[in-house]
Amino acid sequence: MAKLSLRNVQKTYAGNVKVVHGIDMEIADGEFIVIVGPSGCGKSTLLRMVAGLETITGGDIHIGDRVVNNLEPAERDIAMVFQNYALYPHMSVYDNMAYGLKIRGMAKAEIEQRVKHAAGILELAPLLDRKPRQLSGGQRQRVAMGRAIVREPSVFLFDEPLSNLDAKLRVQMRLELKELHRRLGTTSLYVTHDQVEAMTLADRMMVLNGGRVEQIGTPLEVYTRPASTFVAGFIGSPPMNLVPVARNGGMAGAGGVAQMRVLGKEGGASDATLGHLPMGLHLPAEALLGLRPEHIEPCAAHDAIAEVDVRVVEALGADSFAYGSLGGQPIVVRLDSHARVRAGDKLPVTSSPDHLHFFDAQSGKRIEA
């Protein structure tokens, strides 16, 4: 095992096309880091640079106490698990797992010990004589992970390993990956576009957008204190509501605290207000109020800070979601499954000041009080 350091890591292709912009991160020995972001954000490129499959055009990558920029993949003491399994179809499960060790000239007894140990961890022992075509998708992915485990690397690299699995199997494999990391404790870097994988697997996560880091933090930190409107909109399902707001003409409300007014779609003030601004918060001319759907609560009309015009209600079993508008702006409210809310209703809502997030509408950056 080893720590992993990314120091001003950059990638530029021919024609001065820059896809990774100076990424810095210190990954502790044994930490499980998830890089998450939309397609084309540079996450797989960054992983491939760590693996040695892409050249680095700026900065340094350290694995342990070595700078590995110019080392071949085989010299970096890493093991990689790919999206497409990459198993040899003519080989048995045992031989697929053992092949890399044989190439390295390891003793037969040591190979057998490592393969059987990994097979025991992954519950593959009864399948060692089978060919890949005789396995399910989840079993094939476990073989791919077993092939990485037997190498006993300093760092595991995972490139969207669950993307080819169906929804039910992805849940099962997430749990198995979490348990695997708990048992092995190997430093791991995991790439995904799936926020659920990121939230459930990560010790810390890096949110990438356009080759730049939007935020690094624990899943709870990223969810509860998003650093930008991009993070607020990307992490969470449904995502955070982002409502354009302004001071209510500079007028003070109760206790001398300014009120917020929702801005309509054309940028003009609507008739909707949203309670009072937190003390000490200074809004720029253009600001966005962020509210998670679960933090908007239906209430009695006299307690409401706003009223939502409900257009659609989706029932999902334990929860329901009301989709509607507030002052002409789209908004989503999470409801109890037993809530009697219908399309066409006007739903009075409230929210705790602790759950209000504010962002600069121009830069998208979080505004702190």
UniProtKB/Swiss-Prot annotation:
Database matches in PROSITE patterns: ABC_TRANSPORTER_1, ABC_TRANSPORTER_2, UGPC
CDD domains in alphabetical order = ABC_MalK_N
EC id: 7.6.2.10
Q: Known SUPFAM superfamilies for this protein?
A: MOP-like, P-loop containing nucleoside triphosphate hydrolases
Q: Which reaction does it catalyse?
A: sn-glycerol 3-phosphate(out) + ATP + H2O = sn-glycerol 3-phosphate(in) + ADP + phosphate + H(+)
The way this protein sits in the membrane is described as: Peripheral membrane protein
Domain named ABC transporter: which ranges? 4-235
Any one GO CC term of this protein is: ATP-binding cassette (ABC) transporter complex, substrate-binding subunit-containing
Which EC class heads this enzyme's classification? Answer: translocase
Subunit structure, as described in the record: The complex is composed of two ATP-binding proteins (UgpC), two transmembrane proteins (UgpA and UgpE) and a solute-binding protein (UgpB).
Family per record: Belongs to the ABC transporter superfamily. sn-glycerol-3-phosphate importer (TC 3.A.1.1.3) family.
Q: What is this protein called?
A: sn-glycerol-3-phosphate import ATP-binding protein UgpC
